[in-house]
Amino acid sequence: GDIIENPTNDNIGSATLVYISAAGSATEAILEKADGSALIGRIKMASGQSITLVKEATDKITCPNSSCTPIAYHW
C-alpha cells in the first residue's frame, strides 16, 4: 500500500498490519478505537526505529515524525 507520512487519526487504509518507521527524531505511535472512545496503546520509538503493529481494520493511528505502510488486510 501507499506510505502515509505523519498520520493523525488514520486507519492506514483499513490495514490490519502496519509497518511504522520513525523518521528523523523520536516519536510515539498512538493507537485508538475508531470512534475515539478508547486508547488501545502507546509505543515510544527512537529515531530510526521501526515496528510492525497489528490492529483492527478500523483502529486509528497517530504517529508524528513517521512513515506508516499498510502491509496486510485481514477481514
What are these regions (language model features)?
Residues G1-W75:
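Surface-exposed, low-hydrophobicity beta-strand/loop segments enriched in small/polar/acidic residues
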